[in-house]
């Protein structure tokens, strides 16, 4: 590891070794992705029972090895059932989704790495199973046409870009703020019939466009890569919804609180947005287990608050409103 893996002047000193390790592993993973090969080959299943691709395993091994010498006591990975002890003298605990969006490898859509940093406690459980607001750092690396990192240490969102000349992340912006005017929402509309009524009602209002109660025309986006969705919303605004639904295995949502939702929520709030499970702020919650799932809504603060308001309506009112909308029934 070298000091040149990331520009460190705006990184808190006690977090610099871990950030240098994350940047180094991210740059190395970006190079592996650029070289190509059969990276989407199925190789097994992870701790959650999701299919693993070859690149999932490569990414997990790479980040684990690189963080081992960076002052990290505990490492929790989405790809592993239990947290791993790295350095008994380490002061940090890192939770990581080494490769988000691996289903997009074959189609060459942007994929990423999501990470979260906590102060290390005596046990892995105490380090990770705590309120998400106790994070001291969080971010993601996006591997797309340009490789970039967004990270927060609780004082705004910093934007770094990977310089291909020396594989170092250079600071692009010190305080990224999310626009609040984008008329865009991201949701997998194929699951409409399974959603709870407040989510259907919100989407129906958006789809009604200028003739509906919102009196504005909205565009829908869906990439099926959380990092790519987050990056677009940080840059352009809008809102992302991945609600719980009626399907088996989706009753509590699908995204993981520790590895995905907590770090993204920290970033989004630091950029001026909001992040909830549909009702309650993600940062006010904690994961009861390492792989706990949760519904997830994030984006421009006004839009996230509006969705929460739909959930607060009495069920009879939502049902009455829903009965008059039902645009997908036509």
From Swiss-Prot:
Its main location: cytoplasm. Substrate binds at residues 100-103, 188. One of its GO terms (biological process) is gluconeogenesis. GO terms for molecular function: fructose 1,6-bisphosphate 1-phosphatase activity; magnesium ion binding. Keywords: Carbohydrate metabolism, Cytoplasm, Hydrolase, Magnesium, Metal-binding. Pathway: Carbohydrate biosynthesis; gluconeogenesis. Mg(2+) 1 binds at residues 78, 97, 99. Binds 2 magnesium ions per subunit. It catalyses: beta-D-fructose 1,6-bisphosphate + H2O = beta-D-fructose 6-phosphate + phosphate. GO terms for cellular component: cytosol. Mg(2+) 2 binds at residues 97, 100, 260. Gene3D superfamilies: 3.40.190.80, Fructose-1,6-Bisphosphatase, subunit A, domain 1. It is an enzyme of class 3 (hydrolase). HAMAP family: FBPase_class1. NCBIfam families: PRK09293.1-4. PANTHER family: FRUCTOSE-1,6-BISPHOSPHATASE-RELATED (PTHR11556), SEDOHEPTULOSE-1,7-BISPHOSPHATASE, CHLOROPLASTIC (PTHR11556:SF35). This is Fructose-1,6-bisphosphatase class 1. It comes from Paracoccus denitrificans (strain Pd 1222). The lineage of its organism: Bacteria, Pseudomonadati, Pseudomonadota, Alphaproteobacteria, Rhodobacterales. The gene is fbp.
């Amino acid at each position: 590891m070298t000091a040149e893996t990331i520009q460190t002047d705006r990184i808190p000193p006690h977090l610099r070794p871990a950030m240098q390790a994350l940047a180094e592993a991210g740059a190395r993973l970006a190079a592996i992705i650029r070289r190509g090969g059969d990276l989407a080959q199925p190789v097994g299943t992870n701790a959650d029972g999701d299919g693993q691709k070859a690149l999932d395993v490569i990414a997990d091994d790479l980040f684990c090895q690189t963080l081992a010498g960076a002052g990290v006591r505990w490492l929790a990975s989405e790809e592993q059932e239990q947290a791993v002890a790295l350095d008994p003298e380490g002061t940090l605990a890192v939770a990581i989704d080494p490769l988000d969006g691996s289903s997009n490898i074959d189609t060459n859509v942007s994929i990423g790495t999501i990470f979260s940093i906590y102060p290390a406690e005596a046990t892995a459980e105490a380090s990770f199973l705590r309120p998400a607001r106790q994070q001291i750092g969080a971010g993601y690396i996006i591997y797309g046409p340009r490789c970039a990192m967004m990270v927060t240490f609780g004082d705004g969102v910093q934007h770094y870009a990977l310089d291909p000349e020396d594989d170092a992340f250079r600071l692009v912006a010190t305080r990224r703020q999310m626009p609040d005017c984008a008329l865009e929402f991201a949701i997998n509309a194929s699951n409409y019939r399974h959603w709870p009524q407040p989510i259907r009602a919100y989407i129906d209002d958006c789809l009604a466009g200028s003739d509906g109660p919102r009196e504005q025309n909205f565009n829908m986006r869906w990439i099926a890569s959380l990092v790519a969705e987050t990056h677009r919303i940080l840059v352009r605004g809008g809102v992302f919804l991945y609600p719980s639904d009626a399907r088996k295995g989706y009753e509590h949502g699908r995204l993981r609180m520790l590895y995905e939702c907590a770090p993204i929520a920290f970033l989004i709030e630091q950029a001026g947005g909001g992040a909830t499970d549909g009702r309650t702020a993600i940062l006010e919650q904690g994961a009861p287990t390492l792989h706990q799932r949760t519904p997830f809504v994030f984006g421009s603060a006004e839009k996230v608050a509006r969705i929460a308001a739909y959930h607060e309506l009495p069920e009879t009112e939502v049902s009455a409103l829903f009965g008059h909308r039902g645009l997908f029934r036509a």
